[in-house]
Amino acid sequence: MMAHQHPYYLVEQSPWPLTGAISGLMMNLGLVLWFHTGNIILLFTGLLLLILTLVNWWRDIVREATFQGSHTAIVENGLRYPMILFITSEVCFFFAFFWAFFHSSLAPAVEIGVTWPPSGITPLNPFLVPLLNTAVLLSSGVTITWSHHSILAGNRNEAIQALFLTVVLGIYFTILQAWEYIDAPFTIADSVYGSTFFVATGFHGLHVIIGTTFLLVCLIRLSGHHFSTHHHFGFEAAAWYWHFVDVVWLFLYVCIYWWGS
């Protein structure tokens, strides 16, 4: 490798952006094919290629950051701004769902009986599973902060325990959400209420799964001594993302589950 008189890391050629784009195309085409013909093979093939891309791309980044020392302090500082912009874009993403919800609920149309929830819709009790899910996510926010402070204090064992609890709570939340969907007395096809409910909470559930995956990778890396008190941006980025997921859920609970019911 040629020496460069600057502190920035120049990435090497990688096949993963191309395979990631191909997997995205395959999943989109596979989804359409599944809807129209019931054939799910292309969708699952694209998903498998996406997982393969993520695993290998993650492996390369871990190698560059941890074993090759390519992520200097200046490089890490440069990674913080894209992560902040990414979370900001996610805020805008969920803002659209809240806009659709309030547009439909504050002035209900005559087609749904000029009432909210619409006529014939039995909303979920916000003080049962949704309240438990709120407690689970708030608890996970506490444990991820506990893990972060343990890393800063150099207490690796405590950091691993706290991060493990966070991953368990994330999985538990996903199980509860799936159970709630199965038992829900309405579907995504039941008026604008069902559409906004399942799209907003469903995309949040997807973000919880993604965040849990991030934290699981961080747990593996933490167990492998990849993080130190001064070099753990991968964990910090995952923690930021998890706190964002927590905050979005609080808005979902208050607006859709409690006020919307």
UniProtKB/Swiss-Prot annotation:
Q: Which InterPro entries is this protein grouped with?
A: Cyt_c/ubiquinol_Oxase_su3, Cyt_c_oxase_su3_dom, Cyt_c_oxidase-like_su3, Cyt_c_oxidase_su3-like_sf, Cyt_c_oxidase_su3_a-hlx
What GO cellular component is one of the record's annotations? mitochondrial inner membrane
Would the keyword Transmembrane helix be found if you checked this record's keyword annotation? yes
Topology with respect to the bilayer: Multi-pass membrane protein
Q: Which residues form a coiled coil?
A: none
Task: Please name the GO terms of the biological process aspect recorded for this protein, alphabetically.
Answer: mitochondrial electron transport, cytochrome c to oxygen
Q: Which Pfam families match?
A: COX3 (PF00510)
Would I find Translocase among this entry's keywords? yes
User: Mind listing the UniProt keywords for this protein, alphabetically?
Assistant: Membrane, Mitochondrion, Mitochondrion inner membrane, Translocase, Transmembrane, Transmembrane helix
Query: Which reaction equation describes what this protein catalyses?
Result: 4 Fe(II)-[cytochrome c] + O2 + 8 H(+)(in) = 4 Fe(III)-[cytochrome c] + 2 H2O + 4 H(+)(out)
Membrane-spanning residues = 31-51, 82-102, 126-146, 159-179, 197-217, 239-259
Q: Name one GO molecular function term.
A: cytochrome-c oxidase activity
Which Enzyme Commission numbers does its entry carry? 7.1.1.9
Q: Which Gene3D superfamilies match?
A: 1.10.287.70, Cytochrome c oxidase, subunit III, four-helix bundle
Top-level taxonomic group:
Eukaryota
PANTHER family per UniProt: CYTOCHROME C OXIDASE SUBUNIT 3 (PTHR11403:SF7), CYTOCHROME C OXIDASE SUBUNIT III (PTHR11403)
Q: How does it assemble?
A: Component of the cytochrome c oxidase (complex IV, CIV), a multisubunit enzyme composed of a catalytic core of 3 subunits and several supernumerary subunits. The complex exists as a monomer or a dimer and forms supercomplexes (SCs) in the inner mitochondrial membrane with ubiquinol-cytochrome c oxidoreductase (cytochrome b-c1 complex, complex III, CIII).
The record describes the protein's role as: Component of the cytochrome c oxidase, the last enzyme in the mitochondrial electron transport chain which drives oxidative phosphorylation. The respiratory chain contains 3 multisubunit complexes succinate dehydrogenase (complex II, CII), ubiquinol-cytochrome c oxidoreductase (cytochrome b-c1 complex, complex III, CIII) and cytochrome c oxidase (complex IV, CIV), that cooperate to transfer electrons derived from NADH and succinate to molecular oxygen, creating an electrochemical gradient over the inner membrane that drives transmembrane transport and the ATP synthase.
Q: Spell out the protein name for this chain.
A: Cytochrome c oxidase subunit 3
Instruction: Identify the species of origin.
Output: Paracentrotus lividus (Common sea urchin)
Highest classification ranks of the organism: Eukaryota, Metazoa, Echinodermata, Eleutherozoa, Echinozoa
